[in-house]
Amino acid sequence: MIKKTARTAAREASADGLNWTFAPMVDISRDARWGRVMEGAGEDPFLGSLIAKARVEGFQGDNLSDISTIAACAKHYAGYGFSEAGRDYNTADFNHYTLHNTILPPFKAANDAGVKTFMNAFNTIDEIPATGHKILQRDILKKD
């Protein structure tokens, strides 16, 4: 069902001339106060991974040269759903175990499904902005 809804959204968007969507939002979030919690798949990384895969496949179809498909963008890489006190653009606090076992699995699922782009998160990790975090950007995203 989720794949079908993403497929429908892709058909509608592509019919209007769009070829790229800033979706799916695959952040795992566990604080209901966060204003973007409804965009994601909830708090379970396994379910979040299944939904990320389905949405990427729905948006992109089997062949991006098909005019009814659009490129997907897995966001927000990574940890944005763990922002403190549920506040947008806030510091995110989590350890490396949580990063690898809770936060990253939906991004890996999106990547394995062939997602064409990633959007960086707005938070810091170890007081380093996610956009410039060497371990996150180079060692994990580019190599793993």
What do these predicted ranges mean?
Residues 1-144:
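Glycoside hydrolase catalytic-domain context in secreted enzymes
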